[in-house]
Structures are given as structure tokens and as C-alpha cells.
């Protein structure tokens, strides 16, 4: 165990912390998100049926809802998929090795070094496929341990105790994920709904206990309420978690009130703005809550830095659907490096601010402390 202290656990093994480089702290390379598919309605079908005009032979007016759900992303349906990305089955799966390599080669070419792959139990985590990508491109990939939302894990954990879940998370970190010898280097993303379910509370407590045994950080997927992060933080604190190594993800779709944001930051946790590139304000999973723009994200992070929280911020894209990949007309894993960092510099971010967000904060969080 002592040989792990001060190092970072990647999919290929332990590395020195200075080998980490520029890091995206919340991404998915392979994932199956079909549990969260929502069937399109008749109105949406009409929107996506492009008539070809008399005699053109290009009409698709006979398209059915089933067709709309299953068709591949194209120029014709691209905007509809962006707006309703949870209603297309093809879009909800990242499962193509060739495309994964192509997309992450672009990330590497633009200066990226490490991807934290936080796909957990219940949504198609695939460490062996991720290992192939890491070996092919010689990039660091850090895998996640633990459990996703109740909807995806109830079949696995309903009859498990907190201790059994804790032991399973520890096993994924110290021995290997599933039937492999590939070890996780972070706990999470730990799925939380709002309100929390009993299984999710067990998962949170188990994750806090596992953190104490492994020396790893915890990455949280909070429920969609501005008060959800504070509730989760309290449960983790009561369970013995080190809050300075707890990352609250999806801040940008969760907290839109600066006072609540600052109250959350005061707990000492890490605030993760991980939806860069998501610029359509409609958020299918958010009810009445809209999705902010990248410019708003840049402004909020800047305000947090000015309040003294520059060492408590990490960023990412959280790509988990095809439409956000360059191969399907999206921004890809290089959007932050290619587009956002130059905008941050124009906004007034210092080199120190940017290095903290991309390199130093991830390095501190991923370094094993016990």
C-alpha cells in the first residue's frame, strides 16, 4: 500500500504526479446511457420529417417515432438531437473504438494529457476498452469506482449493505474493476438523485468510508436542485469524508444562485464546472432549469477565483452522447483547450488561474494520500 502514496493510479498503473499534465476531470469514453432514454412524441416527429417536394423522391414524411428513436445522427436531425439528446437511442451510446481513438487523438494533439473516465457501475463502464485507447494513444486515463444513479444500480445494490458496497468500491480501487486487474484512481461519479433514494444514501456513505481506506478523491453527480450539493456534502461529512477531496460535479446545471454557490464553496469541497460545450439552454433532464452558456461558466468561475476559491475548481465537458463528439458534429474533448482557454485569458484569467484549474488542482485531487 505504501508504494501508492504520492502517486496517481491510471488505467495502466501508478504514475508520478508530475506526469499527469493537462487533465479533464469528468469525461466518458465508453458509456451506455439507454436507461435514460425518453420516447419522442408526435410533435417532434413532425419537426424531423423533411418533405422533399413534388417528385423529389427525398421525402421522409412516412417516418415513425420508432424511426426517429433509432436513426443515426445526420444533418437533417442534428438540431433535434442536440435539443433532445435523450430521445435518440443511437446518441445515448459511446461504443465505437475507432471514433474514441480519433476523438482523443485530437485531445492529445491540442495539449491534453489525462482523461478522468468517471463511468461507474450501471452505465456500461468498460475498463478493457479504455485500456486499449490509453495504450494506442499513450494518454493517461483514470477510471472511476462506485455506483451511478438508483435507476441504473438498484438491481445490483438493493440487497447490499453499506459495508458490502464499501468493500466493493475498495476492491475496485485496490484489486481491480469487475474481473480485471485495472484499478480505479477516483471514487465516482457517485450518482445522486433529488431527492436522494435509500440506495443512493447507502452509496454515498459507502463512498465516504471507501475514501478513508483508499486515499482517493470522490466525484459526485448531484441531484438537480440547488440545495442538493449541500445535503450530499453533509452526509459525506457525517460519514467521515475529507471534503477537500470531494468534487461536486455538474455545478453549472445545478447552482445558479451566487450565494448558494459561495455557501457550497465554503464547505471546502471542489466545484466542478464540467459541461463546457453544452450551449443549448434547453436541458432535457432539468425541468424548468436551463443550461448556462460557456460565457456564463467563465464568468462564474472568475467570480469564484476572485472570492479566493481558485484552488477549488476543476473543469471538463462530461461528454456522454455522440452528438457532442467532433465525429458527429459536436465540439469534442478539445473544446476547452482550443476555445475556452483563449476566452478565459481575454476575460482576465491569469496563467496561474488556468494552470490551477487544468493541472495543479487535478494533480492534488488525484494524488493518493494513503
From Swiss-Prot:
The UniProt catalytic activity note for this protein reads: N-acetyltaurine + H2O = taurine + acetate
Q: Which domain of life is it from?
A: Eukaryota
Q: Which UniProt keywords apply?
A: Cytoplasm, Hydrolase, Metal-binding
Q: Name the Gene Ontology biological process terms.
A: catabolic process
InterPro entries in the record: Metal_Hydrolase, Phosphotriesterase
Record's GO cellular component terms: cytosol
Molecular function in Gene Ontology: N-acetyltaurine hydrolase activity; zinc ion binding
Compartments, record wording? Cytoplasm, Cytosol
User: What EC identifiers does the entry list?
Assistant: 3.1.-.-
Please list the residues that bind a divalent metal cation 2. Answer: 189, 221, 250
| Residue positions binding a divalent metal cation 1 | 26, 28, 189, 318
What's this protein's function? N-acetyltaurine hydrolase catalyzes the hydrolysis of N-acetyltaurine into taurine and acetate.
The family classification in the record reads: Belongs to the metallo-dependent hydrolases superfamily. Phosphotriesterase family.
* The protein, known as: N-acetyltaurine hydrolase
Q: Which organism is it from?
A: Dictyostelium discoideum
Provide the gene name from the record. Answer: pter
